[in-house]
Regions:
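Nuclease-adjacent, charged terminal/linker segments that flank catalytic cores
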Residues: 1-20
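Acidic-basic catalytic patches of nuclease active cores, encompassing PD-(D/E)XK
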Residues: 23, 27-81
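A short acidic (Asp/Glu
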Residues: 49, 55, 120, 160-166
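Extended hydrophobic secondary-structure segments that form protein cores and membrane-embedded regions
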Residues: 72-79, 108-110, 150-154, 212-214
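Catalytic cores of nucleic-acid endonucleases
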Residues: 113-160
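Non-catalytic C-terminal interaction segments of nucleic acid-processing enzymes
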Residues: 169-218
Length: 218
C-alpha cells in the first residue's frame, strides 16, 4: 500500500493522482506486452535490454492507439543517481513514466528475465533481487520515492514457478533488503493476475517503499 503523502517523499503530487497514474502504467504495460509477444524479432533468447526496447516501442503504440495526450511520458534506459550531488549515473533504469515537470516526478520500473528452470532459474531470480529490487532499496533507482515496480519477463512459461523462486531468494535476503511484511497480492492498482507487492525501507529514508512485482509470460 502507498503510505500517506508527505513532503519528504519525492514524486508525490497527490495520493489519488499517483494511484491512477500507476494503474494506467500497469494497464499500458499489460496491453503492450500482448504486442511484444507477437513480434518476430523477440523470443526467449533475447536479452533484457532488447525485450525492454521492444516493450518501449509497443508502449508508445498503445499510448497513441488510446489517443492519450497527457501523462505518462514514457522514457527508456534513463540515467539514475541516488543523489543529485553525484556527477555520474549509478545505473540506467529501464523505464521512467513521467507525470509532471519536476526532475523526480516519475514512476520507475526495472525489468528482468525470470525462469523456474534449474540453475538458470535460480541465477535469474538472484539477478532479479540483487540487480533489480536492491537497486530500489539502496536508492540507486528512485531515491526518495515510496513506490516503484519490477517487471519479470517469464521465459519458460511457468509464471508460478518463477514467482516462487524470486520469493525464495528475496526471503533469504529480507534483512539486507530491509523488507517488512510478506509477499502479497497487490490489489490497489487494478486487476492483474500476476501482480504482487513487497514493502521495504529504502536506505537513508524514514518511510517505507512499496515495490510492485508484475510478471508477464514471454
Amino acid at each position: 500500500m502507498l503510505p500517506d503523502d508527505s513532503a519528504a517523499i519525492i514524486g508525490s503530487p497527490g495520493r489519488l493522482f499517483r494511484i491512477n497514474i500507476i494503474a494506467t502504467v500497469l494497464d499500458l504495460v499489460a496491453e503492450a506486452w500482448k504486442s511484444v509477444r507477437k513480434r518476430s524479432d523477440i523470443d526467449n533468447s533475447s536479452n533484457e535490454d532488447t525485450i525492454a526496447g521492444a516493450l518501449y516501442q509497443e508502449l508508445w503504440e498503445e499510448w497513441k492507439k488510446r489517443g492519450m495526450d497527457g501523462p505518462p511520458r514514457i522514457e527508456n534506459e534513463v540515467a539514475s543517481r541516488s543523489s543529485s550531488s553525484r556527477l555520474l549515473p549509478e545505473g540506467f533504469i529501464d523505464f521512467r513514466f513521467v507525470y509532471h515537470w519536476g526532475e523526480q516526478d516519475f514512476f520507475g520500473m526495472e525489468c528482468k528475465k525470470v525462469s523456474s528452470t534449474g540453475r538458470t532459474g535460480k541465477y535469474l531470480a538472484e539477478e532479479y533481487v540483487n540487480e533489480g529490487v536492491m537497486r530500489f532499496v539502496t536508492g540507486k533507482y528512485c531515491s526518495g520515492h515510496d513506490v516503484a515496480a519490477m517487471l519479470g519477463f517469464v521465459v519458460d512459461s511457468n509464471i508460478a514457478g518463477s514467482v516462487g523462486l524470486v520469493q525464495s531468494v528475496l526471503f533469504n535476503k529480507q534483512y539486507v533488503a530491509k523488507q517488512s511484511g510478506q509477499w502479497n497480492i497487490s490489489k490497489l492498482f487494478g486487476n492483474h493476475s500476476n501482480l504482487y507487492e513487497t514493502t521495504h525501507q529504502q536506505y537513508g529514508q524514514a518511510f517505507h517503499m512499496t515495490i510492485l512485482h508484475l510478471f508477464q509470460e514471454l
